[in-house]
């Protein structure tokens, strides 16, 4: 029966090692995502008519990078592994044993944007609108890293494109990482970068990002395997969906406020 499904490609998560230092596919995917965001950010800065310059983009992306790393790790521990953290506080620092949470990373980036906006004496929403279209590609690369790592796979299914993941018991499962790559990485990137081709009210781009990611993540959670460490309300809604709902509601609220209060930029 397993022959009708797709065998997971056996890929070593470590590309190469030099002594104690190893380069992993997961880390490389994030580096590619960050490099692309840097390139696109510089390109947009040159086209901004002096609103942004290279030094300001450097500061924003550097600070945002640490917001993603620190917020993502703390969020993963608090949202998904809090019981383990209480038993072993040093688990927080062992990133290779747990991973990072998008929602925690988002909180970290928001804190970073508040600080950068203050330093650059500009509106928070101007900063958020600038960085929002840079994010999806990196998210997509992160999901490719999850796929290579044989983690965060989907629920058992009999669809023809089901994948037999080794760590998933070689049961046919939804390749939910690839669904998220397509929706959060490709489709959301296309939507946001098409949206900004015309002048938009301040805050509307950030609001659209929140709605888009929240909706896509909420939908994919229906086929993504439930984290055994997380208890949800009668298994009717996952932790990821609970965390995505405020994004959707908040994003709609931001867009309504933006179109009612601000002029197109």
Swiss-Prot record:
<comment type="similarity">
    <text>Belongs to the Lgt family.</text>
</comment>
<comment type="function">
    <text>Catalyzes the transfer of the diacylglyceryl group from phosphatidylglycerol to the sulfhydryl group of the N-terminal cysteine of a prolipoprotein, the first step in the formation of mature lipoproteins.</text>
</comment>
<feature type="transmembrane region" description="Helical">
    <location>
        <begin position="60"/>
        <end position="80"/>
    </location>
</feature>
<feature type="binding site">
    <location>
        <position position="143"/>
    </location>
    <ligand>
        <name>a 1,2-diacyl-sn-glycero-3-phospho-(1'-sn-glycerol)</name>
    </ligand>
</feature>
<dbReference type="InterPro" id="IPR001640">
    <property type="entry name" value="Lgt"/>
</dbReference>
<feature type="transmembrane region" description="Helical">
    <location>
        <begin position="95"/>
        <end position="115"/>
    </location>
</feature>
<protein>
    <recommendedName>
        <fullName>Phosphatidylglycerol--prolipoprotein diacylglyceryl transferase</fullName>
        <ecNumber>2.5.1.145</ecNumber>
    </recommendedName>
</protein>
<dbReference type="GO" id="GO:0042158">
    <property type="term" value="P:lipoprotein biosynthetic process"/>
</dbReference>
<keyword id="KW-1133">Transmembrane helix</keyword>
<keyword id="KW-0812">Transmembrane</keyword>
<comment type="pathway">
    <text>Protein modification; lipoprotein biosynthesis (diacylglyceryl transfer).</text>
</comment>
<keyword id="KW-1003">Cell membrane</keyword>
<feature type="transmembrane region" description="Helical">
    <location>
        <begin position="236"/>
        <end position="256"/>
    </location>
</feature>
<feature type="transmembrane region" description="Helical">
    <location>
        <begin position="176"/>
        <end position="196"/>
    </location>
</feature>
<feature type="transmembrane region" description="Helical">
    <location>
        <begin position="203"/>
        <end position="223"/>
    </location>
</feature>
<keyword id="KW-0997">Cell inner membrane</keyword>
<dbReference type="Pfam" id="PF01790">
    <property type="entry name" value="LGT"/>
</dbReference>
<keyword id="KW-0808">Transferase</keyword>
<keyword id="KW-0472">Membrane</keyword>
<dbReference type="GO" id="GO:0008961">
    <property type="term" value="F:phosphatidylglycerol-prolipoprotein diacylglyceryl transferase activity"/>
</dbReference>
<feature type="transmembrane region" description="Helical">
    <location>
        <begin position="14"/>
        <end position="34"/>
    </location>
</feature>
<dbReference type="GO" id="GO:0005886">
    <property type="term" value="C:plasma membrane"/>
</dbReference>
